[in-house]
Every structure is written in structure tokens, then in C-alpha cells.
């Protein structure tokens, strides 16, 4: 048995090492191996008696308990044998469903009776050394609510801490369930919050910190080599009703007069409640006079029921002084490429039908939404519809040097008043240009015209492009050179090729205009240049490689994603600022937006399917037991209401390297390294991007070995790290093997550029799946997998991404969030093919883009349920993953693409995981 086989337990995952035809013990065989008797098959459809331990995985994150006992203790390498994966000889483990942790203090008054958020933090147990009786809050003197609490450094020393437990990476199989496990808990006593509510601290699905215990000095942070950053995701669903947060409706907003932080659960009330001390800068502020008065019912209100004192995530309805101008309507300008390439590929017809079918999904509660349509080829084609008219008038502007609006009105169409004319236009849009032979694409002039149309009110420009812009301002050249791919000069292909797009993006941001790109490739599209527009205007880039409407899978994917895009509730005219306690400064910002100042991020429209990373610098020594960060986003909802979304997270402080490492969040660190490397790839070189990932990992391992690792025993020298960071090396390796960073001469610049777009913006759960895809074994999944319970569809347990675990007769699913792959082994038997796909042989299955058939068979039903469940997990994304069928005896290129996701294997120019660990081991030697 090879070293790799032993590491991953080969023989227990695949067929027995002695005889590949011996069935796994404890399973009832269902599918016979070709050429073997039925009772010797290693395919299973049932598990041994009893239910499998664990339950459904739904992609949610549990929240670390404030003041609760540490939950991330696993045991040391000396106390615990190496982790091994569940074999076919025992029942599989399922990732646990996250249950809401409810209030355990029955005597405590409940938070406001609002729509309960999906996050609820555990309360301090009664045995905690930090007594807390919330019933006293409001009945005793307000100045006594924090009685006995020290705000000095001594107070921090008494807090519970996470235990540091070391593991030897080289002797432990990566425990990939950690990717969906909660981060190390934030050990902050509930008594530090004003009301003691379990929802006082921000849950990780909104804000994650790379360290959940903040060093008191910059020297300690530098010495630790752990990056300090926040991962922020203000919205977790495409529509608010899917994940509502409490709303402060009385427009009474109290903010610190010095640092401007909003009052929050960690504000400290003094002077009998007339004033409060800011938990960020420490200055004393007056409480608004009407803070305890319900102006709607004209009665006294209970202060301790106010949402902003009980919930870390709230929306404030903004008063008039927060408005520069009246709320503007939601506006979409569809800029459509109507060149010969677009018409012949079917893009124009598919897009017009998708828009038509999505008109009722566009947020338009107040009836103010507006749309416009501009076609571009060698001229600009405008479409005018008068209110109540049934037909549109086409107006053509051929002057591309100085494009102008042919009419002052009726180009921007009220969706409700002009509905019939809009529908008729979209129904015949494809046929209007069916005979075109024009191959020109005047994207630049079209963008300028669209901007001029909406510059006074703002909105979104949705570009649907199938060919390279080749006339007018912003025209691009075909610069793809296969000889540069995989070389040091490849980075030049990832940099913008025309300054027009970045300068135009800045102009759009100033006038509250956002640009989104839907790019369809039949050839080179220069994604690197065109993605500049969404990057600086808070937009998004979607790329459809080799798209053609004649493939139903292609048409369905685009139509679904465009529908999701138009259905998404977006926030308009938004600005976001992240504030921190004294001594902390936000230094760098990553994501799609424009920096108006050093710490103010501007979003003409705020998408709900992206996340942002903010790097933090410690400038002064911190003397308080905890620090606070607050993200505030001022915006206008798509229904015309001005609001401020506020997210507050407080973290304990420490002067201990041990506490720092025990509280580090490997997932947040991986996301920080990802966005920083993506930035380097776009501004510098791919080599520097890859080096930045590995060098930071080596620094962390070196510090751990020097300061925290146990004494080496025996002849073998371990490669140690704490349990909460044990997946960081694997994630770093996966990053360097990702399409965005992998050294390869077979990755086009367009594919690499779109990968960098996704790596820079995907929310944390989806990013982890994109970096380290999820692998499921479907031919031998337990009987519970794919069935529906009260918690939803049960998913099989995930496997490590190594081909050592694949069987030649198996059926597997790989999910990257962007793509899904069904892999059927070359030795698959007819019964498996019949049950899964309704065919008798592999030859009857066409590899490539694939639609899973729906047949009356239990296995097929379960597989379809699993595919649907995985797509439903992405409720905060507009992306519908493409499904591919890969045959073990099929197209070598398709197989190569599939196996490129197996990041623990050795691949082109890249080591296996074990080889990578050996390299790290050599780098961190004294």
C-alpha cells in the first residue's frame, strides 16, 4: 500500500485491497459488479440496522457562545489517534444541522417580539463565573448594570479562553467537516452587553474575524503573523423576507458624537440612564429625550425592548437628515449586443424572453421601477414607448463619436405604465434583427448613452455582450496569445487593456450608476478589461463560456440567472463605513465598490450576493477587555425607503499568543488570503499572488513551531498547528491549484479572469466550496441520503478530494457552486445506470452539459433531491450551477477538468497534499 493510500485509508473507501470484489461489511449490496455474482457487489443501497449518526447539512453556521464553555477542543496529537475517514464498513457521518440556541434563562425578559433572526447565541450558563440576571436590568440603578465589571486589562485576563490543542498535520487526514463548522467561539460574557440578550453579538454569517481574540498591541499581532481582517456580508439572502432582521421604526437614532458609532448592545448606560458611554471611544453621550417614548402609540416604552440594544444586526429607518435627495426609483437599462454573433447564438432571443418572463419579479411595490432598452451594433438603437401605447418606436443613432439621446422622453419607461408596449417589444426583439449581418459592437458609445440617460437619477446598466467591442470609444483588440499562458508574462493578459473602462466606471460611481456584465463567449471576450466596470461600480460579472442557446442547458442556466438577478432586492445609493474601537484602524478594503475616501466605500447599488473584506491595523495599545467593530451601511431600499443597516461585533482582547492562535478562524483567514492574492494577480503578477499565499502560511507555521508547539519526541519531526487551523494548509494548497492562480498553459485568460472575479466577491460558504469543492459518493450512499426529513433533504457525508477514494464502478458528484459534475466510472454496471439515468450502458450517456433525467426510481429521485438541495443552499446567490456528466471512459479533456478539482492529488506543476506538507516541513525547520 502506498503512502497516499495509507493516508486516506485506501481499501476502506474503495474495494478491499485484497479483492476488489469483496462487498463492504455491514451493507446490503444492491448493484452487482459487472461479471460478478449479485451477492458480491460493492454497491449499496442500504446501511446496517440503526440510523446514521448526524443529520442534515444546510450550509448554515452555528454561532460561538458568549461566555460559554469552549466548543472547539478536540484533543492533542498525543491524546488522540489520527483522524480517519468513515469507511464503507461503518455508517457514514452527516454534517450536523444547525439548530437555534434559545434563551435558557426563563426568568429573563425576552427581546422584542420581532421576527426572530436565524441567529441566536447561547447564553452564559448558570455555572459561569460571570453572573448575570437580566431581570435586574432596568429595575436597579442603571449605573449598576455593569457593576463589578473591570474595563482594564485585568478584566480581560479573567475571561474564559479557547484551549489551544496541537495536531501533527502530517499524521492526520484533513477533516473537511471543519469547513462548515462554526469558528472558535467569541468568549465574551453576556454581562458586557446592555441587555444580556443572546443576540447581542454579530453571528459569523454576517461578520467573521480572522481572530476572535484581539491582541492588545501591534507588536503581538506582528509577531503572531496571523492577518487581522473582517469578512463582511451585510445581506445573506436575495430577498429580505428570506432572512429578515429587526427594524427600528421610530427614526430615533443615537450616535456617538465623537466616533459616530451607532448605539448598540455593548453601549454602557450611566447616570440613571440619561447618558451612555460609547463602547468604541469611551466618550459619554446624551440619550435622546424621546428614546423611552413610543411616539406611534403615545405611551412609555421599555428601553430594554429596543431592537438596537438586543440585536447585533438591525435596520434603522433613517430620518430626513440622512437623505441628500428624495429616494430614486429602481432603474434598469438593458444594453444588448445585437451583432450577428449575438443573434446567431440565440443570446438576444433568450435574453429578451427571460426579461419578459421576469418583469413581474422586478421589485416594483410602489410602481416606480423603470426600464430602458438600447441595442448596439455599428449604431445605437433606442426604443421609445409612450405611456399606454402598445408598440415601441425604434430610433437609430449612427454617430458613435458623440452619441446623443434621440428623444428627451419616453426612452426611460415606467414598468407599470408602459407594460404592454414593453411586452410587445420584447416578444419581437429577436425577429427585428434576425437578418442582420452587422458584426460590429459599439459597446463604449452605448455605455456613454446609457449613462447619459440615467445620470440624474442613477440605476443599473445591464450589459448583455456576445462579441468583443470593436468600434467607437472603448474598442478592444484580440490580445490573447497562447504562447504567454503559463509564463511569467501571462499576467499582462489579466490587466485591463483600455483605460476607458476604469475612468468610465469612476464617472458612473459618482452619478450612482452601477454596471453589470453578462458576457457570452464564442471566442475571446477580454473579461479582464470588461470586468473593470462592475469592479468599481459595485456590479457583477457573469461569463458564459462557449455559450449557445441551441443547448437547452445553456439557455436554462442563463435564463435562470438573469431571472434571479432581476428578482434580487437591491439597495441603492449606498455607502458603507467600518468603525472600530480606539487604537484600531481599517487599512485596506477588498470587494466590488469605489473608495470615496480612506474608509468610505461607495455602492451605486448594493448587491446581496457578494461579500467584502476589511483589513485592520492596531495603532495604539488596547487597554480594554474587549473591542468593538461596527459596519454601517446607509442605503435606499428598492421600495424607496432610506435605511441604515448596522452590524456590531465585539471581541475580547488578550496579551497571549496562545489565546490568539486558539481563537483564529481558518476560514476567514483563507478568505482574506484569497482576496489579497486576487488583488495581487490583477495589479501585479500571478507569481506574486501565489507566493503571498504560501509565504503567509509558512510564517504562521514557523511562529507556531517556535512559540506554541510542544516538544518534539521520537525520531519524526512533526508539522504542528492548532486544531482550529488544521485545514489552513489544505485551503492554501487548493488556492494555488485553483483556476484563478494555477500555473498552466491550458487556462485561457478569460477563464482565469472570471475565476478571479468570483474569488474576490463570493460569500464565505460559497467561496469555500469554490476553493475546495464538495465530493459525494452517490452509488453507496446511506438510505437516509436524498430523503426528506423535517430539516429538509439529507445530504451524504462529504469525502476528501483525492482520486484515491474513487472506485471505477462508482457514481460521484462534485459541487463547486459554479459547476456540478456527475462522474460515472468506466466499470459501472447496467443496474446502476438504469437506476440513476434510465439507460442500459455507458454508451447511451452523452458526456458534457447534462440535464439529470427524472424517472420513477428511488435512486434517481434521491440524486435529483440532492442536486436540488445543493442549489437551494445558495439562497444568497444568483448563480445556477452548470451540470456536467463525466464518463470514466469519456473525453480526456472533460476528465482532466473534472480531476483538476481533486486538490489533494498531484497535478500539473503542483504537488499532492502530502508532498505539499513535506515541503512546508522543510521550510519551517530551524
Curated annotation (Swiss-Prot):
Bias type Polar residues, positions: 73-85
Keyword Metal-binding: yes
Molecular-function GO terms, alphabetical: SNARE binding; zinc ion binding
Family matches, as Pfam families: Gelsolin (PF00626), Sec23_BS (PF08033), Sec23_helical (PF04815), Sec23_trunk (PF04811), zf-Sec23_Sec24 (PF04810)
Biological process (GO), any one: COPII-coated vesicle cargo loading
Annotated positions binding Zn(2+): 256, 259, 278, 281
InterPro entries in UniProt: ADF-H/Gelsolin-like_dom_sf (IPR029006), Gelsolin-like_dom (IPR007123), Gelsolin-like_dom_sf (IPR036180), Sec23/24_helical_dom (IPR006900), Sec23/24_helical_dom_sf (IPR036175), Sec23/24_trunk_dom (IPR006896), Sec23_24_beta_S (IPR012990), SEC23_SEC24_subfamily (IPR050550)
Protein localization: Cytoplasm; Cytoplasmic vesicle, COPII-coated vesicle membrane; Endoplasmic reticulum membrane; Golgi apparatus membrane
Keywords, in A-Z order: Cytoplasm, Cytoplasmic vesicle, Endoplasmic reticulum, ER-Golgi transport, Golgi apparatus, Membrane, Metal-binding, Protein transport, Transport, Zinc
Membrane-topology descriptor: Peripheral membrane protein
Region (Zinc finger-like): 255-281
Chain segments carrying region Disordered: 1-21, 73-93, 107-134
GO cellular component, as recorded: cis-Golgi network; COPII vesicle coat; cytosol; endoplasmic reticulum exit site; endoplasmic reticulum membrane; equatorial cell cortex; Golgi membrane
Protein function: Component of the coat protein complex II (COPII) which promotes the formation of transport vesicles from the endoplasmic reticulum (ER). The coat has two main functions, the physical deformation of the endoplasmic reticulum membrane into vesicles and the selection of cargo molecules.
Protein family per UniProt: Belongs to the SEC23/SEC24 family. SEC24 subfamily.
Assembly, per entry: The COPII coat is composed of at least 5 proteins: the SEC23/24 complex, the SEC13/31 complex, and the protein SAR1.
Annotated protein name in UniProt: Protein transport protein sec24
Organism: Schizosaccharomyces pombe (strain 972 / ATCC 24843)
Amino acid at each position: 500500500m502506498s503512502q497516499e493510500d495509507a493516508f486516506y485509508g485506501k481499501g476502506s473507501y474503495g474495494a478491499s485491497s485484497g479483492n476488489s470484489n469483496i462487498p463492504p461489511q455491514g451493507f446490503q449490496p444492491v448493484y452487482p459488479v459487472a461479471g460478478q455474482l449479485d451477492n458480491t457487489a460493492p454497491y449499496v443501497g442500504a446501511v446496517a440496522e440503526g440510523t446514521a449518526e448526524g443529520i442534515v447539512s444546510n450550509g448554515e453556521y452555528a454561532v460561538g457562545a458568549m461566555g460559554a464553555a469552549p466548543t472547539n477542543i478536540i484533543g492533542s496529537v498525543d491524546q488522540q489517534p489520527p483522524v480517519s475517514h468513515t469507511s464503507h464498513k461503518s455508517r457514514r457521518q452527516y454534517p450536523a444541522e444547525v439548530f437555534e440556541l434559545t434563551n435558557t434563562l426563563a426568568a429573563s425578559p425576552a427581546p422584542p417580539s420581532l421576527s426572530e433572526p436565524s441567529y441566536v447565541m447561547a447564553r452564559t450558563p448558570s455555572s459561569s463565573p460571570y453572573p448575570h440576571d437580566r431581570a435586574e436590568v432596568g429595575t436597579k440603578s442603571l449605573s449598576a448594570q455593569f457593576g463589578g465589571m473591570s474595563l482594564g486589562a485585568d478584566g480581560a485576563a479573567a475571561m474564559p479562553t479557547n484551549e489551544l490543542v496541537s495536531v501533527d498535520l502530517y499524521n492526520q487526514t484533513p477533516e473537511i467537516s471543519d469547513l462548515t463548522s462554526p469558528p472558535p467561539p467569541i468568549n465574551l460574557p453576556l454581562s458586557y452587553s446592555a441587555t444580556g440578550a443572546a443576540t447581542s453579538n454579530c453571528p459569523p454569517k454576517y461578520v467573521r474575524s480572522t481572530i476572535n481574540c484581539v491582541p492588545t498591541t501591534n507588536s503581538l499581532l506582528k509577531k503572531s503573523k496571523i492577518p487581522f481582517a473582517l469578512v463582511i456580508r451585510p445581506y445573506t439572502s436575495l430577498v429580505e423576507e428570506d432572512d429578515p432582521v429587526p427594524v427600528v421604526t421610530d427614526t430615533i437614532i443615537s450616535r456617538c458624537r465623537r466616533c459616530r458609532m451607532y448605539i448598540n448592545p455593548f453601549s454602557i448606560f450611566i447616570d440613571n440612564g440619561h447618558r451612555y458611554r460609547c463602547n468604541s471611544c469611551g466618550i459619554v453621550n446624551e440619550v435622546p429625550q424621546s428614546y423611552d417614548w413610543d411616539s406611534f402609540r403615545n405611551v412609555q416604552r421599555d428601553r430594554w425592548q429596543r431592537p438596537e440594544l438586543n440585536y447585533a444586526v438591525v435596520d434603522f429607518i433613517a430620518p430626513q437628515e440622512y437623505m441628500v435627495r428624495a429616494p430614486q426609483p429602481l432603474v434598469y437599462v438593458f444594453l444588448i449586443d445585437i451583432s450577428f454573433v449575438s443573434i446567431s447564438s440565440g443570446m438576444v432571443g433568450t435574453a429578451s424572453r427571460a426579461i419578459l418572463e421576469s418583469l413581474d419579479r422586478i421589485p416594483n411595490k410602489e410602481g416606480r421601477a423603470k426600464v430602458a432598452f438600447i441595442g448596439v451594433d455599428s449604431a445605437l438603437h433606442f426604443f421609445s414607448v409612450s405611456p399606454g401605447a402598445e408598440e415601441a418606436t425604434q430610433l437609430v443613432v449612427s454617430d458613435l463619436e458623440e452619441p446623443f439621446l434621440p428623444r428627451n422622453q419616453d426612452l426611460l419607461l415606467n414598468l407599470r405604465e408602459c407594460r404592454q408596449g414593453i411586452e410587445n417589444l420584447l416578444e419581437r426583439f429577436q425577429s427585428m434583427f434576425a437578418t442582420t449581418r452587422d458584426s460590429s459592437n459599439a459597446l463604449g458609445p452605448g455605455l456613454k448613452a446609457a449613462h447619459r440617460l440615467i445620470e440624474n437619477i442613477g440605476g443599473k446598466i445591464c450589459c448583455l455582450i456576445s462579441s468583443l467591442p470593436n468600434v467607437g470609444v472603448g474598442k478592444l483588440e484580440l490580445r490573447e496569445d497562447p504562447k504567454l499562458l503559463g509564463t511569467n508574462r501571462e499576467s499582462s493578459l489579466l490587466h485591463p487593456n483600455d483605460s476607458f473602462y476604469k475612468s468610465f466606471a469612476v464617472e458612473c460611481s459618482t452619478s450612482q450608476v452601477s454596471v453589470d456584465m453578462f458576457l457570452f463567449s464564442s471566442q475571446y471576450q477580454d473579461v479582464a478589461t470588461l470586468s473593470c466596470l462592475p469592479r468599481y461600480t459595485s456590479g457583477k460579472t457573469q461569463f458564459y463560456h462557449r455559450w449557445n442557446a441551441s443547448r437547452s442547458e445553456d439557455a436554462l442556466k442563463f435564463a435562470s440567472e438573469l431571472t434571479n438577478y432581476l428578482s434580487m432586492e437591491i439597495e441603492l445609493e449606498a455607502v458603507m463605513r467600518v468603525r472600530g474601537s480606539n487604537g484600531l484602524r481599517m487599512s485596506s478594503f477588498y470587494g466590488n465598490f469605489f473608495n470615496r475616501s480612506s474608509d468610505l466605500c461607495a455602492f451605486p447599488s448594493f448587491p446581496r450576493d457578494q461579500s467584502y473584506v476589511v483589513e485592520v491595523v492596531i495603532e495604539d495599545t488596547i487597554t480594554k477587555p474587549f473591542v468593538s467593530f461596527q459596519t454601517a451601511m446607509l442605503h435606499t431600499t428598492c421600495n424607496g425607503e432610506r435605511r441604515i443597516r448596522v452590524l456590531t461585533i465585539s471581541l475580547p482582547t488578550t496579551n497571549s499568543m496562545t489565546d490568539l492562535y486558539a481563537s483564529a478562524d481558518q476560514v476567514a483567514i483563507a478568505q482574506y488570503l484569497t482576496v489579497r492574492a486576487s488583488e495581487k494577480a490583477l495589479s501585479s503578477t500571478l507569481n506574486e499572488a501565489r507566493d503571498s499565499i504560501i509565504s503567509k502560511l509558512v510564517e504562521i507555521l514557523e511562529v507556531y513551531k517556535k512559540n506554541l508547539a510542544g516538544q518534539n519526541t521520537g525520531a519524526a519531526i512533526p508539522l504542528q498547528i492548532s486544531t482550529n487551523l488544521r485545514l489552513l494548509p489544505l485551503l492554501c494548497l487548493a488556492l494555488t491549484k485553483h483556476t484563478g492562480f494555477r500555473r498552466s498553459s491550458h487556462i485561457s485568460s478569460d477563464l482565469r479572469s472570471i475565476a478571479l472575479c468570483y474569488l474576490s466577491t463570493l460569500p464565505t460558504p460559497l467561496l469555500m466550496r469554490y476553493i475546495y469543492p464538495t465530493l459525494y459518493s452517490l452509488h453507496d450512499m446511506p438510505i437516509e441520503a436524498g430523503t426528506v426529513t423535517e430539516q429538509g433533504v439529507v445530504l451524504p457525508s462529504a469525502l476528501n478530494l483525492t482520486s484515491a477514494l474513487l472506485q471505477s464502478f462508482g457514481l460521484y458528484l462534485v459541487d463547486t457552486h459554479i459547476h456540478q459534475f456527475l462522474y460515472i466510472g468506466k466499470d459501472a454496471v447496467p443496474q446502476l445506470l438504469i437506476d440513476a439515468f434510465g439507460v442500459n450502458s455507458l454508451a447511451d450517456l452523452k458526456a458534457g452539459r447534462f440535464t439529470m433525467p427524472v424517472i420513477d426510481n428511488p435512486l434517481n429521485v434521491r440524486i435529483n433531491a440532492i442536486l436540488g438541495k445543493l442549489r437551494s443552499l445558495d439562497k444568497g446567490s444568483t448563480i445556477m450551477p452548470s451540470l456536467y456528466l463525466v464518463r470514466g471512459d469519456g473525453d480526456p479533456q472533460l476528465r482532466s477538468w473534472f480531476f483538476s478539482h481533486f486538490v489533494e492529488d498531484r497535478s500539473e506543476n503542483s504537488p499532492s497534499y502530502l508532498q505539499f506538507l513535506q515541503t512546508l516541513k522543510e521550510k519551517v525547520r530551524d
